[in-house]
Swiss-Prot record:
EC number: 2.3.1.129
Pathway: Glycolipid biosynthesis; lipid IV(A) biosynthesis; lipid IV(A) from (3R)-3-hydroxytetradecanoyl-[acyl-carrier-protein] and UDP-N-acetyl-alpha-D-glucosamine: step 1/6
Name of the protein in question: Acyl-[acyl-carrier-protein]--UDP-N-acetylglucosamine O-acyltransferase
A biological process term (GO) from this entry: lipid A biosynthetic process
InterPro entries noted in UniProt: Acetyltransf_C, Acetyltransf_C_sf, Hexapep, Hexapep_transf_CS, Lipid_A_LpxA, Trimer_LpxA-like_sf
Organism this protein belongs to: Yersinia enterocolitica
Catalysed reaction, written as an equation: a (3R)-hydroxyacyl-[ACP] + UDP-N-acetyl-alpha-D-glucosamine = a UDP-3-O-[(3R)-3-hydroxyacyl]-N-acetyl-alpha-D-glucosamine + holo-[ACP]
Keyword Transferase: yes
Protein purpose: Involved in the biosynthesis of lipid A, a phosphorylated glycolipid that anchors the lipopolysaccharide to the outer membrane of the cell.
Superkingdom of this protein's organism: Bacteria
Any GO molecular function: acyl-[acyl-carrier-protein]-UDP-N-acetylglucosamine O-acyltransferase activity
Family as reported in the entry's similarity comment: Belongs to the transferase hexapeptide repeat family. LpxA subfamily.
Amino acid sequence: MIDKTAVIHPSSIVEEGAVIGAGVHIGPFCFVGSQVEIGAGTELKSHVVVNGITKIGCDNQIYQFASIGEANQDLKYAGEPTRVEIGDRNRIRESVSIHRGTVQGGGLSKVGSDNLLMINAHIAHDCIIGDRCILANNATLGGHVEIDDFAIIGGMTAIHQFCVIGAHVMVGGCSGVAQDVPPFVIAQGNHATPFGINIEGLKRRGFDKESLHAIRNAYKLLYRSGRTLDEVKPEIAELADQHPAVQAFIDFFARSTRGIIR
């Protein structure tokens, strides 16, 4: 179904069965598959491919040569009907690729809302991206990676399969991330190591001085006390009881499967 207010360039192909919302603009030489749903106000600039079982929300801007919903590169993938979901108000720049999920990984690759995916970023199968994240040029995510809200991934950075990147993290450019990065942390290098707390980012997002001080103290326990994670967890949990912002560390530790960067 194509809404009567949608504008589709005559050189583009929209297969029968696709759902195209109000005010959608599909520019020249695009392809939209039969199982695709595109929400109101979204624009495909030109030469964009959206295929597979893919649902795109409202008011997204998708630039030239982006490829969304194509088959993933997992060697186990046998054409199962897996999906891609994208939220609202994302900017998906030139040549970004977002692959559909795998059955083994839950069948879904998901991007939230208000994200900026810069030129040539790659989101592999079963990745889960939160809201208000930035993936800079040529950032590459392996399969099953999770990126929490407000994280920034620098250009030319590669993230290993199954890694979790916490909220408000900043990973510097040209890094290789092979383990999980706790929330609020700045990480850099190959293999990435911690370089303190993303204080400026947290200030911009409204964290008060007391919360920032508590987050710093949690970081010091984690990285500067010379003790193991299991040894410092109880003290960080005590901090979290007094300062709710620190609870993000405790919740993150419970999710981590690859261990945290050191």
